[in-house]
Amino acid sequence: MKPTNEPKKPFFQSPIILAVLGGILLIFFLRSFNSDGSFSDNFLASSTKNVSYHEIKQLISNNEVENVSIGQTLIKASHKEGNNRVIYIAKRVPDLTLVPLLDEKKINYSGFSESNFFTDMLGWLMPILVILGLWMFMANRMQKNMGGGIFGMGSAKKLINAEKPNVRFNDMAGNEEAKEEVVEIVDFLKYPERYANLGAKIPKGVLLVGPPGTGKTLLAKAVAGEAHVPFFSMGGSSFIEMFVGLGASRVRDLFETAKKQAPSIIFIDEIDAIGKSRAAGGVVSGNDEREQTLNQLLAEMDGFGSENAPVIVLAATNRPEILDPALMRPGRFDRQVLVDKPDFNGRVEILKVHIKGVKLANDVNLQEVAKLTAGLAGADLANIINEAALLAGRNNQKEVRQQHLKEAVERGIAGLEKKSRRISPKEKKIVAYHESGHAVISEMTKGSARVNKVSIIPRGMAALGYTLNTPEENKYLMQKHELIAEIDVLLGGRAAEDVFLEEISTGASNDLERATDIIKGMVSYYGMSSVSGLMVLEKQRNAFLGGGYGSSREFSEKTAEEMDLFIKNLLEERYKHVKQTLSDYREAIEIMVKELFDKEVITGERVREIISEYEVANNLESRLIPLEEQAS
């Protein structure tokens, strides 16, 4: 949706501005009257002069004034000079000789009220009117931005414009299964009569689910582009505003506009903003505006009056588990299409799409980049290509080289390299032992990812060093020994500090937290312990947003104590095993630490070389895990 380009009115044609100016003029006009309805002297005078009371009395004594008006706090004396009338105004002071003096000089005098009914009323009403005017002005501006006036309830019609996307399926890569699922939708939209003649009902809606950055919006645009139909897009949060009923009104307007241009596609991004379940834990939620909007969406998707106007609703979310069951039933969202993170081949194809227009050197190997980026989404890969191009430009290079791509991958995974951050030799030594411990355990533990690089250069906000592990492929299942291997690798850093420095630091805090979470999952969710057996103790949170496990406790205090004891014992058992492994390879780790201290970075190949040379020199049986067994 794009806002229409409506001509703006000139500033002084705004009704609110004109009303304010009119009110100011009215005040000046009403102030020209006395309380008896006659024009005030100030209005008839050519000029007024503020003088002292003594001067006014002197003018009266010299017979230089014609009329005197006496108020409660002011005294006015008028004097005519040729064709001009001058009014002298002074603060009144208690003076019993004034009236006798006026009688003696035979000067006309009278009393006057210093305020009148009109100005008194305006004095009370004007602040209220100003506040009301400002509120109406701000509310009107806000509602215009939302698609309507203050009393127009923000009609969505002014915001809706149909797009004709130029995106095609060929512009997408890495989601072949998802594309196959929606190809049929394109056929429905192109040839609706073919299916109508067979008595088939066209699907009302397709829900695209998957992690952030996997191309759900792009896929929806590609469907519209392939079918050559109008594409209406709106974010879920755009339906709900401060006025109750506005969301339902916008849903009606959106579907009405789409039906007029049918066949067409409506795309609702982040539909969980309006489609959240109305009951959570058996208690009905109380957001009336969202519920009205959802009810209207359900009614529209039931297709009242739309049998001959094929409008297909595509929606995207990364939180399908919280959507209302009424929204998910057949007849509304008939299908769910998983748009997942790409596998190795998918990443290669996505990289090929994003390198179009980028000048690449001959040494660029996209397969190697794809191996380094397991678990990343399409948006991450696009960012890596762009970051590599920026790095090449920053270094005044004419082409993007493989090194730029590798640096971009590391930057995306570990954060920006902080070469300016100076750490003391003592801390540098601690970090070198810590990262060497991670690297050695990773290379000698079956089921762990292969080491690609070890660095003690600070990166990101907190990392003083890092070990870059690159799994050969995405993992969809984890066996128990693989979880144990991950725990061992996480404990390797702290164990190395303990073995070689005989003192531990705070650098392993995140490693310990992650190791604890893995064991907690084994106990409470995966049924991999004697504590729970096959019983699930906690529910997993959002699968696509990485929410971990729920905090609701569905077990007794005794079970909680047993769980804590199991986690503690397993951590101690694996820590003891890791310390023993590092002690067995003490000299190899010392060599690794020295090279890290001198060079700051060593490759995974060099790590494996150091371990292998140590084993040969000491006639040890190799404990290095071969590549084909590394993640099996």
Curated annotation (Swiss-Prot):
Pfam families: AAA, AAA_lid_3, FtsH_ext, Peptidase_M41. Residues 31-116 are periplasmic. It is found in: Cell inner membrane. ATP binds at A173, G213, T214, G215, K216, T217, H354. It is a multi-pass membrane protein. Residues 1-9, 138-632 are cytoplasmic. Zn(2+) binds at H434, H438, D511. GO terms for cellular component: plasma membrane. Its cofactor is Zn(2+). GO terms for biological process: protein catabolic process; proteolysis. Its EC number is 3.4.24.-. InterPro entries: AAA+_ATPase, AAA_lid_3, ATP-dep_Zn_Metalloprotease, ATPase_AAA_core, ATPase_AAA_CS, FtsH, P-loop_NTPase, Pept_M41_FtsH_extracell. Disruption phenotype: A homozygous disruption strain was not identified, suggesting this gene may be essential. Keywords: ATP-binding, Cell inner membrane, Cell membrane, Hydrolase, Membrane, Metal-binding, Metalloprotease, Nucleotide-binding, Protease, Transmembrane, Transmembrane helix, Zinc. The active site is at E435. The keyword Membrane applies. The chain crosses the membrane at residues 10-30, 117-137. One of its GO terms (molecular function) is zinc ion binding. SUPFAM superfamilies: FtsH protease domain-like, P-loop containing nucleoside triphosphate hydrolases. Binds 1 zinc ion per subunit. Homohexamer. Acts as a processive, ATP-dependent zinc metallopeptidase for both cytoplasmic and membrane proteins. Plays a role in the quality control of integral membrane proteins. In the central section; belongs to the AAA ATPase family. In the C-terminal section; belongs to the peptidase M41 family. This is ATP-dependent zinc metalloprotease FtsH. It comes from Helicobacter pylori (strain ATCC 700392 / 26695).
